[in-house]
């Protein structure tokens, strides 16, 4: 391991040693010896020792049901501790001093100056910078909140241990605390006993904001200001908010019957209660600090003549915030309200104006150093979080709106809306949107499904403008899908304009997105209400599941490119909303590389992107880590706008069209065309058992009785991740490249790798995926869990995988995967020693459970769940 990572290696060894001591104390030395023996055998097996591999298999297959849980837990917990150490490494002071990232804002500003980009252009681009991260509750965060708090505390201990001036006593005390935390984690059940409710998920999202983002946002703004002042002699305006947050948690009802209108209402109140509580804590600190006596005459005239004028203003705000916290607390506890709404804060401006006046007065009185302290941090938080804490997106599937309108049109005697032609639907919707009379009959009683749709729209109508950020239509296919939601909102009493966002998800829908938006922009009523602003969401998960990674990636690129060109032509300001997951099969990639691979001009109005599942913890879970993530996002957006990527050559486009078609055909010939694929998938992976894992609140299938096509993209990816074949992330992609090379296109493809960020990023993503696959482990799943007559399919897929790896290596002119990123290769190699036993244990556990499905052993079920979470920790990007 390189010298610069010696701190990481030492931390991993220390945490592993403490875990071993904990296990010995809790389970006895015999269990620890067994675990250590398995670890050594796994290490030797990875080194090619066949006898060690045979002994490893024999040892794991003969473990008693009683001992299998502590063994599984040991390897799972070590992988979690490794993740903590690796996450800390990114913010370690020693690491930052040694490794200056060329992807950072600081490096970008220096590069911009070196390339003589005008300072005015840089500053104006920074002023438009917007990073909007949308937190989602997708069921990929397998780590319980009870453990997350302990993991954060472990990280803090590692930070304190890094100080060189610690006394022996201080160092011993910190290490003892680490041992306590690891022991607490060991004695905590890592598997939830029941699925979280949407409200539980919302509490998890609120905790991320409270424990990390609340501090990270003003810290990042300070860091941005330092870079601007150092390089261009200016500072970012206090009025600007480069980072904002929205959430789907409590608003995303697509396929989740547990997210109701009442859920949304409750989550909105919870958010406001927590925001008031957090601002109250800030204001209390300000109240203690702002004992300053000098202020401007304007300030004194506005707020009165007081000895400590700022403290009086802040104390008034504190009194209102105390009542605001109490008011929303009573609502959450279903108590009758004792507080007048005139006495609470309901609008951001009520908090912003007096504090901004304090800020201005302090500046004008020569107290800039005071103004730019805690007060400035508070102002930044108002601009970012506001009194709603985060904006809430509403999401629902298009078919649900169609069914609701069909119910209405049938009742009023117009026939079945769902059976009408698209032109007729649009004509009806535009006529009703333009009409002053209501559409809904006064005495009509809708079905429960339609009632829920309408009640959700009424909840939206009750919110102040800006609290709900947008209404997203999943599986959007037509212009009428968008107009239908506008009509339902109008009928529910929404009087302000709420952006309605079509989400184009499948290959066909992405390809048709330009035509759909053209139709909408040509509707006079629509152009009149959108104020020349439009958001469109690009779906990564379902398009990749539908057509494979390569075809989906190209369809996403072309759709964005066409939408950018269309909106520029029509004079519409376009915001592209990226629905990415953490894995390659769901659009995931390192943030910086992913953004620089976007089409030119697609980021000029900022970035809006989902942060999903476990990626929220890895990228945003600690303040310093979140600041790093913001920095990477910001540098990539600014670089894309100031040093845009090249327009792809026509020859590159021709190759991509060919790769898209051939990769899609290869992918679908397996996933859809082979009659044995579904039974193979269900037996070769723990897909059926995954449904028992109490992860998120949302069911794993849209249709409980359906096949793979009804399976959501997340469990689809998760299942293949478990058996190390990782099929959705690569099937069809490299094979299509190989076919193109065989046709004589190698030189062009190598040129694309070198000069086109879109293509080189895809190749890099494939290389990362391939480095995590394992054909021997995948075969082991087949030989023990799959019927013999289906073995041919697994063998064929593994042969494809091996051929695909050779293709990628031939393009990179390397002998080994990830040779240009040796640390990642080493990290994967280290993890494999601990992940391999979990994979082998999982096979044994699945075999035992499937042999006796009517009477499953609870210990075996529990151990299986632990292997699933442990492998997820080992693979990092699970969904």
UniProtKB/Swiss-Prot annotation:
Stored Gene3D superfamilies: Phosphoenolpyruvate/pyruvate domain
Instruction: Extract the InterPro entries matched here.
Output: PEP_COase, PEP_COase_bac/pln-type, PEP_COase_Lys_AS, PEPCASE_His_AS, Pyrv/PenolPyrv_kinase-like_dom
The cofactor named in the record is: Mg(2+)
Pfam families found in the cross-reference section:
PEPcase
- UniProt catalytic activity: oxaloacetate + phosphate = phosphoenolpyruvate + hydrogencarbonate
Q: Does the keyword Membrane apply?
A: no
GO terms, biological process? carbon fixation; oxaloacetate metabolic process; tricarboxylic acid cycle
What would be one Gene Ontology cellular-component term for the protein? cytosol
What EC number(s) has UniProt assigned to this enzyme? 4.1.1.31
- Membrane-spanning parts: none
Q: Which UniProt keywords apply?
A: Carbon dioxide fixation, Lyase, Magnesium
Give the residues annotated as active site: 138, 545
Similarity section? Belongs to the PEPCase type 1 family.
Give the function comment from the record.
Forms oxaloacetate, a four-carbon dicarboxylic acid source for the tricarboxylic acid cycle.
Question: What is the protein name stated in its UniProt record?
Answer: Phosphoenolpyruvate carboxylase
Species this protein is from = Histophilus somni (strain 129Pt) (Haemophilus somnus)
């Amino acid at each position: 391991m390189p010298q610069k990572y010696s701190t990481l290696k030492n931390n991993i060894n220390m945490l592993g040693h403490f875990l071993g001591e904990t296990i010995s104390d809790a389970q006895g030395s015999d269990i620890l010896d067994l675990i250590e023996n398995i670890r050594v055998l796994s290490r030797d097996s990875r080194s090619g020792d066949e006898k060690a591999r045979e002994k490893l298999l024999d040892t794991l297959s003969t473990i008693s049901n009683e001992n299998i849980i502590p063994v599984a837990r040991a390897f799972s917990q070590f992988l979690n501790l490794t993740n903590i150490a690796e996450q800390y490494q990114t913010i370690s002071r020693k690491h930052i001093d040694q490794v200056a990232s060329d992807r950072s804002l600081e490096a970008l500003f220096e590069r911009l100056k070196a390339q003589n980009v005008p300072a005015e252009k840089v500053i104006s681009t920074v002023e438009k910078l917007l990073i909007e991260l949308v937190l989602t509750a997708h069921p990929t965060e397998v780590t319980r909140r009870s453990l997350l708090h302990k993991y954060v505390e472990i990280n803090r201990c590692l930070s304190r241990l890094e100080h060189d001036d610690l006394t022996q006593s201080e160092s011993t005390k910190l290490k003892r605390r680490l041992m306590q935390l690891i022991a607490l984690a060991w004695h905590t059940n890592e598997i939830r006993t029941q699925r979280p409710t949407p409200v539980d998920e919302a509490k998890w999202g609120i905790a991320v904001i409270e424990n990390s983002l609340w501090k990270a946002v003003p810290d990042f703004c300070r860091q941005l200001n330092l870079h601007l002042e150092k390089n261009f002699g200016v500072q970012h305006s206090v009025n600007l908010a480069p980072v904002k947050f929205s959430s789907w948690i409590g608003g995303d009802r697509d396929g989740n019957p547990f997210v109701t209108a009442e859920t949304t209402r409750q989550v909105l109140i919870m958010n406001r209660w927590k925001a008031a509580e957090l601002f109250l804590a800030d204001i209390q600190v300000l109240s203690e600090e702002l004992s300053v006596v000098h202020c401007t005459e304007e300030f004194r005239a506005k707020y009165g003549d007081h000895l400590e004028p700022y403290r009086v203003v802040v104390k008034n705000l504190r009194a209102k915030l105390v009542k605001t916290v109490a008011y929303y607390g009573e609502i959450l506890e279903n108590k009758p309200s004792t507080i007048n709404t005139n006495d609470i804060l309901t609008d951001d401006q009520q908090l912003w104006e007096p504090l901004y006046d304090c800020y201005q007065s302090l500046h004008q009185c020569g107290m800039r150093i005071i103004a730019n302290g805690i007060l400035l941090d508070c102002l930044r938080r108002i601009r970012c979080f506001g009194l709603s804490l985060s904006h809430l997106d509403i999401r629902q599937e298009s078919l649900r709106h169609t069914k609701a309108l069909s119910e209405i049109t049938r009742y009023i005697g117009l026939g079945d809306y769902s059976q009408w032609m698209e032109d007729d639907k649009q004509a009806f919707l535009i006529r009703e949107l333009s009409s002053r009379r209501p559409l809904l009959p006064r005495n009509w009683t809708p079905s429960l499904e339609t009632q829920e749709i309408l009640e959700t729209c009424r909840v939206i109508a009750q919110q102040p403008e800006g609290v709900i950020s947008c209404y997203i239509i999943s599986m959007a296919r037509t212009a009428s899908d968008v107009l239908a939601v506008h009509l339902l909102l109008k009928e529910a009493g929404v009087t302000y304009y709420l952006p309605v966002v079509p989400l184009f998800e499948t290959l066909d829908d992405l390809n048709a997105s330009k035509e759909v938006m053209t139709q909408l922009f040509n509707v006079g009523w629509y152009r009149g209400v959108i104020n020349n602003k439009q958001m469109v969401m690009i779906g990564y998960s379902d398009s990749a599941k539908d057509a494979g990674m390569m075809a989906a990636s190209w369809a996403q690129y072309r759709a964005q490119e066409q939408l950018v060109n269309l909106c520029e032509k029509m004079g519409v300001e376009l915001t592209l909303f990226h629905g990415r997951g953490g894995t390659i099969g769901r659009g995931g990639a390192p943030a910086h590389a992913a953004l620089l691979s976007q089409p030119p001009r697609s980021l000029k109005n900022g970035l809006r992107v989902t942060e999903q599942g476990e990626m929220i913890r890895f990228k945003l879970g600690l303040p310093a880590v979140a600041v790093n993530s913001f920095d990477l996002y910001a540098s990539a957006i600014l670089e894309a706008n100031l040093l845009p990527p090249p327009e792809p050559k026509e020859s590159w486009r021709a190759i991509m069209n060919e790769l898209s078609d051939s990769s899609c055909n290869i992918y679908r010939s397996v996933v859809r065309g082979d009659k044995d694929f579904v039974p193979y998938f269900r037996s070769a992976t723990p897909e059926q058992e995954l449904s028992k894992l109490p992860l998120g609140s949302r069911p794993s299938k849209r249709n409980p009785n359906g096949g793979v096509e009804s399976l959501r993209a997340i469990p689809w990816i998760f299942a293949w991740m478990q058996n190390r074949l990782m099929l959705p992330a690569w099937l069809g992609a490299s094979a299509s490249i190989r076919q193109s090379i065989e046709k004589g296109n190698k030189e062009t493809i190598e040129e694309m790798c070198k000069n086109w960020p879109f293509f080189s990023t895809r190749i890099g993503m494939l290389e990362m995926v391939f480095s995590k696959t394992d054909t021997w482990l995948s075969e082991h799943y087949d030989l023990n869990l799959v019927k013999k007559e289906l073995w041919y399919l697994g063998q064929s897929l593994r042969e494809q995988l091996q051929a695909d790896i050779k293709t990628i290596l031939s393009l990179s002119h390397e002998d080994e995967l990830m040779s240009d990123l040796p640390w990642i290769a080493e990290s994967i190699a280290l993890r494999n020693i601990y992940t391999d036993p979990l994979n082998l244990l999982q096979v044994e556990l699945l075999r035992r459970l499937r042999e006796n499905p009517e009477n499953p052993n609870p210990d075996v079920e529990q151990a299986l769940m632990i292997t699933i979470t442990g492998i997820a920790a080992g693979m990092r990007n699970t969904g």
